Amino acid sequence: MKSLLILGDGGYGQLVKEIAEILGYRKISFLDDNLPIAIGKLNDIDVLQDSYDETIVAIGNPLVRSQNLLKLKNPTTLIHPSAVISKSAEVKKGVVIEANCVVSASAKVYEGSFICAGAVVNHNAVVNKCCQIDCNAVVSAFSKVPDGKKVASCEVWKNI
């Protein structure tokens, strides 16, 4: 039985849980500082993470996400089965790729980034650490998204 500990039990945490369930995780728990139904607070990660196969951060704030990502011993990457990831693309640990996304040839998605439903990371593009490429956004070919940047829904990001 694959197990997953998710840091953050807000709306995005619930979305991450649904992807994890589709991918076959059966034991899924949360750490959250604000919700009493979580099994603990974010600071409990050091004690609790050894009881899980893998961990992931599902927190929207990129600074908080980055800080918590550094604490994970076994960060995982969750990719929805409907996403299309090129064989030559590079997707690092702690990334969430939602339904109907495309990560094209030679694209790179770095640690802790969220690629939201329907987004496209075109060929040779780079999404740096802890970014959020929101629903139906496009990162144009050869473009680079800086650390912690949110590309808004339906926005086209290009910097060529």
Indicate where each model-derived feature is located.
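Structural signal for interior beta-strand "rungs" in well-ordered beta-sheet cores
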Residues: 77-160
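Terminal amphipathic alpha-helical/low-complexity segments used for targeting or macromolecular assembly
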Residues: 1-81
